Amino acid sequence: MNKKKTPNNIEDLLSLFSETLTPADVLSAKLMAQFSNAITSERLNLNMSQKDFAKHINATQSLISRWECGDYNFSINKIAEIAAKLDLNVDFKINKCH
């Protein structure tokens, strides 16, 4: 009996598709997941519902939902705009992979 392993994190999930994803696809997915998680964490730290959080930063609840579930391709400008509204620092580190 061959039991399939359920992915526990983004790396496990991405490894399932490693033959069809480029390294850029993998990196992009990881970065979007990190930013989505940061937005969700900040909302939860503020003890706000998605609806209240949307009002707080002048967005819609459906947009907050898309941000949090990773169904949004953030531009650098959008990341900067969200971070400024939430008084968050964004730090990109660029290093050699190997």
Which functions belong to the PLM regions below?
Residues 43, 54, 83:
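The alpha-helix within a helix-turn-helix
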